[in-house]
A protein has these predicted regions:
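Hydrophobic faces of well-ordered beta-strands that scaffold small-molecule active sites
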Residues: 3-7, 31-33, 59-63, 106-110, ...
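A short alpha/beta connector and helix-capping loop motif
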Residues: 13-45
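Glycine-rich tight-turn/loop motif centered on a GG-T
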Residues: 21, 31-38, 69-84, 118-122, ...
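Acidic (Asp/Glu)-rich catalytic clusters
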Residues: 22-26, 47-60, 99-101
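Glycine-enriched alpha-helix->loop->beta-strand junction motifs that scaffold or abut catalytic
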Residues: 26-30, 53-56, 131-138, 154-161
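Glycine/small-residue-rich loop that forms an oxyanion/phosphate-binding "nest" at active or ligand-binding sites
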Residues: 68-107
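Hydrophobic, well-structured mid-protein blocks that either form specific transmembrane helices
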Residues: 100-148
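Active-site rim beta-loop-alpha module in soluble metabolic enzymes
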Residues: 146-166
Length: 166
């Protein structure tokens, strides 16, 4: 078993500061980068990607519901097409920024309510897993151990990393 220290970063918003991001990027192996829907913007994504590259940290997309007012923590009921679009849009903006630095997005981990809902709901978990497979089947999908997300990911034979919190 390999341990990968992972952290959510680039989450500058009215709810959070990103002042500690550079220090955290000295100790983590991989970063889940906010993609602008719950927090962050192109500037913060660019800064995190730049430091990730410097420190050899894997870059991951951290997509969420478009809910900056509640930091992506409000549960929203969206159609499968809407879920697919929000995942693709957020992944693509981060991937485009990463490419400008000669990097790629290596993994994806949903944020907040989107993640929490998918942990409990196999239908939503399946929509997310299928969407990820459709836009980049090589991404590592970070999922909570024993969740509906893990179950759905296995149906699609996805590369997964099971997370635990310490």
């Amino acid at each position: 078993m390999e341990i990968n220290i992972n952290c959510d970063l680039g989450e500058k918003s009215k709810h959070h500061s990103d002042e500690n991001d550079p220090k955290l990027l000295e100790i983590v192996n991989s970063a889940n980068v906010a993609c602008g829907y719950h927090a962050g913007d192109e500037d913060s994504m660019n800064q995190v990607v730049k430091i990730c590259k410097k420190n050899g940290v894997s870059i991951g997309a951290h997509p969420s519901f478009n809910d900056p007012e509640n930091f992506g923590r409000k549960r929203l009921n969206l159609s499968s097409d809407e879920i697919n679009k929000l995942l693709i849009d957020q992944y693509e903006i981060l991937q485009n920024i990463a490419e400008k630095h000669g990097e790629i997005v290596t993994h994806i981990k949903p944020h907040g309510a989107l993640n929490n809902m998918a942990c409990e709901d196999i239908e939503l978990a399946t929509i997310i897993a299928k969407s990820i497979c459709n836009f980049n089947k090589d991404l590592i999908y970070l999922v909570p151990t024993g969740s509906k997300m893990e179950e759905a990911a296995k149906k699609f034979d996805m590369r997964i990393a099971c997370e635990i919190f310490a």
